[in-house]
Amino acid sequence: MKLPEKKYIASFDIDAQNTFTPICPNELPVVEGDQIADELNAQAKFASLRIASRDAHTNEALWLSDETNPPLSPIEGHPNLDIRWPAHAIIGTKGFDFIPGLDPAAYDFQVYKGIEVDKHPYGACYHDLGNKLSTGVIEYLRCNGITTVICGGLATDYCVKNTVLQLRNAGFEVILNKAACRGIAPETIASAMAEMEAAGVKFIENASELEEN
């Protein structure tokens, strides 16, 4: 795939954290989630800026599941919470850390999301579910003249999909590197891919398909 000039390109590593891998089996493990670092690093070579998002939660979060309120059970009365989840990506734990092979110092901009106890966003562009409270990443990309964003991360069918759609709605061209993503379930991955394709997202199988201008 022919790319625009490098100065117009950013590479986005979405929630590539241990919490979404078998490294943390009691959190939200995604099969092979710890095997995408090489592809994320490869796609970053085609970009002038490298950005990342990370879930950054606390043990006081109102969406935490327990024996009375199991995972995926609905939450009422909180506009920025939809369902319950097991504890994951708690700040200061192994789950919060990047997956092996990613260097925190390699990034130009990072988003920490879900810090507030009453918010559990999926996309990395907004802190709320209504896409109103900006994380600043859209503005950062615009200020730096970025027009195209190459994306990968975890998980395809949740945070990756939502972030990609937010970027498209903000007017960016988006390329999703399939080899730099892993998802939770075949049916939800397929649905996410269809939704992203309908929004105009372009797909590559891996970073070797990218071609510099």
Each language-model region and where it sits:
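Short acidic/polar alpha-helix capping motifs at helix-coil junctions
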Residues: 63-64, 126-130, 157-158
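Gly/Ala-rich phosphate-binding loop of Rossmann-like dinucleotide-binding domains
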Residues: 164, 168
